[in-house]
């Protein structure tokens, strides 16, 4: 029995998990589908749990590393590369993939509370993504492309979590359009939050449409997005002679 047989089992089972989840995975059906003997299957994986652990370690982990591969060891062009990854997520989305949802998110919700080994392995997959993005953000700060006040780890966690959330909301709505819209909003939001003023124009070619105000201010999103990281605008208010209030900034 060769290593290629083992890899084939893992890949086919990963695809089955993507489609219907881990709990519904039937090893007997996969054995029949692969046209291998039970002996060959159980030679590699003595039980379903061991199969699941191997799928996470050997298929899911590299799958998610590859998603963010363009950010690994990057030194310049971080914001543009990050926005491009999100653009790719929109491009490759299909009605079927959206209805299935994100396989990592699905498995976290399905298995992390019933099997702590699963939880730990799924956390590793999550953390690998966070570390790639975190390192890239730190490089962007050093290059002067990203704002210095950005907390790299918190922002990396936020990005991974936001994308997982986009998949989850779109899955429950069974709507590719919702996914594309949400990720587009995420792109605009990240540009506002992350990119230093001097580097803002360099990422405009991969972002969604924006409009510029008549006063010449920096581009504003056409969709009203609340920026959770922005400081509120300070206004100086004084009482008028009529007893009302007015703002000097009006």
Positions of predicted regions on the chain:
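Helix-turn-helix
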Residues: 8, 16-58
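Small-residue (primarily alanine) positions within well-ordered alpha-helices
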Residues: 12-13, 156
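Hydrophobic alpha-helical connector segments
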Residues: 54, 68-100, 152-159
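Amphipathic alpha-helical packing segments from all-alpha helical-bundle domains
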Residues: 80, 116-142, 154-157, 184
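Amphipathic alpha-helical segments used for helix-helix packing
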Residues: 95-117
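Long, low-complexity, intrinsically disordered segments
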Residues: 218-250
């Amino acid at each position: 029995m060769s290593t290629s047989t083992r890899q084939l089992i893992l890949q086919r089972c990963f695809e089955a998990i993507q489609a219907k989840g881990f709990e519904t995975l039937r090893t007997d059906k996969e054995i029949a589908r692969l046209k291998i003997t039970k002996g060959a299957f159980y030679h590699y994986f003595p039980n379903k749990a061991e199969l699941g652990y191997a799928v996470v370690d050997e298929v899911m982990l590299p799958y998610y590393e590859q998603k963010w591969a363009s950010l690994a060891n990057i030194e310049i062009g971080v914001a543009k590369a990050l926005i491009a990854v999100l653009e790719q997520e929109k491009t490759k989305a299909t009605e079927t993939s959206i209805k299935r949802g994100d396989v990592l998110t699905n498995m976290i919700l399905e298995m992390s509370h019933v099997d702590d080994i699963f939880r730990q392995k799924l956390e590793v997959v999550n953390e690998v993504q966070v570390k790639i993005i975190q390192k890239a953000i730190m490089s962007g700060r050093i290059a002067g492309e990203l704002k210095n006040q950005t907390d790299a780890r918190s922002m990396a966690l936020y990005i991974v979590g936001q994308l997982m959330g986009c998949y989850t909301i779109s899955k429950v709505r069974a709507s590719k359009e919702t996914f594309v819209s949400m990720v587009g909003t995420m792109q605009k939001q990240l540009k506002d939050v992350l990119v230093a003023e001097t580097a803002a124009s360099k990422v405009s070619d991969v972002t969604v449409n924006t409009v510029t105000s008549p006063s010449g201010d920096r581009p504003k999103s056409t969709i009203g997005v609340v920026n959770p990281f922005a400081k509120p605008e300070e206004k100086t208010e004084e009482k008028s002679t009529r007893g009302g209030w007015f703002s000097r900034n009006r």
